[in-house]
Amino acid sequence: MKRMADKKAEPLLAKLKTDPNNSQLLNQIGMLYKATHQFKDAAGYFQKAVDADPKNVAARTDLASCLFYQGDADGAIQQLQQSLSYDPKDANSLFNLGMIRLQAKNDPHGAIAAWQQLLKLNPKLADDKKAAVQKLIAQARKPKVSE
């Protein structure tokens, strides 16, 4: 998978040599590596993208995902909170924040708060996405059964 990502990234990496601080280009390269589950490589490019453009919420949200997949939930949450400081309505950041709080931090209340904020601030969210978020909220509210 890494070899495939490296091959697809070659033309973008060539462009990057002449424009090393191009946040969009760095983000594209990060997406190639993320798609092939090369999260460490992807995180490096997403980090460079947000270094070049700190307000690049999409790159910051993708960086957070990669950090989470590498086991750094705290780093992921920090990146998502930074994203939300630039764009408090960003649905992807709010959704991911809820998932990470629930899955990595066992914080259903924090997850529900993030998802409720997502629904409140994004009234035009597609119905299927609203339904999916509402389902997650309902599941997070259910008490865990002890084994």
Regions found by a protein language model. Give the residues of each.
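Residue-level recognition of tetratricopeptide repeat
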Residues: 31, 65, 99-100, 139
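Canonical tetratricopeptide repeat
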Residues: 28, 62, 96, 131-132, ...
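Terminal, low-structured helical/coil segments at or just beyond the last alpha-helical repeat
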Residues: 106-147
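Structural marker of alpha-solenoid helical repeat scaffolds
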Residues: 18-19, 52, 86-87, 121, ...
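Register position in tetratricopeptide repeats
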Residues: 35, 69-70, 103-104, 139-143
